[in-house]
Amino acid sequence: MAQAKKGAPKKGQKTRRREKKNVPHGAAHIKSTFNNTIVSITDPQGNVIAWASSGHVGFKGSRKSTPFAAQLAAENAARKAQEHGVKKVDVFVKGPGSGRETAIRSLQAAGLEVGAIADVTPQPHNGCRPPKRRRV
């Protein structure tokens, strides 16, 4: 069975090319869980311009939760965002993971100017029952 060629679209098919936006100021949302770190850079309206995660960068399993994986994910997202003209970001950090501070530092090192830093971790007012304690 022959496989369809990837690349050029078929005749009459619409293509969706990613247009380069010019957004000088944005927001960096860092979601750091115990298993992964996701960095999304958005415009002021909240539309995602660039994103990267520890898994997307190439880490698997328990290595996704390391600060080094978060650093590479943040650098990757910052590089993509700078192609769209982002120069300054406000940082919103969510979650208890180990890659929080490392991701913020690597956004600065990648050349983005960091404005405000806010912790937006959701706090339950005694909502769902937490998972059972681990016994190792």
Curated annotation (Swiss-Prot):
Keywords: Ribonucleoprotein, Ribosomal protein, RNA-binding, rRNA-binding
One Pfam family per UniProt: Ribosomal_S11
Biased composition regions of type Basic residues, renumbered to the chain: 7-20
Residue ranges, annotated region (Disordered): 1-31
GO cellular component: ribonucleoprotein complex; ribosome
InterPro entries in the cross-refs: Ribosomal_uS11, Ribosomal_uS11_bac-type, Ribosomal_uS11_CS, Ribosomal_uS11_sf
One GO process term, biological-process aspect: translation
GO MF assignments: rRNA binding; structural constituent of ribosome
Keyword Ribosomal protein: yes
Disulfide bonds: none
NCBIfam families according to UniProt: PRK05309.1, uS11_bact
Entry similarity comment: Belongs to the universal ribosomal protein uS11 family.
Subunit description: Part of the 30S ribosomal subunit. Interacts with proteins S7 and S18. Binds to IF-3.
Function in brief: Located on the platform of the 30S subunit, it bridges several disparate RNA helices of the 16S rRNA. Forms part of the Shine-Dalgarno cleft in the 70S ribosome.
Listed PANTHER family: 40S RIBOSOMAL PROTEIN S14/30S RIBOSOMAL PROTEIN S11
Protein name (Swiss-Prot/TrEMBL): Small ribosomal subunit protein uS11
Organism: Mycolicibacterium gilvum (strain PYR-GCK) (Mycobacterium gilvum (strain PYR-GCK))
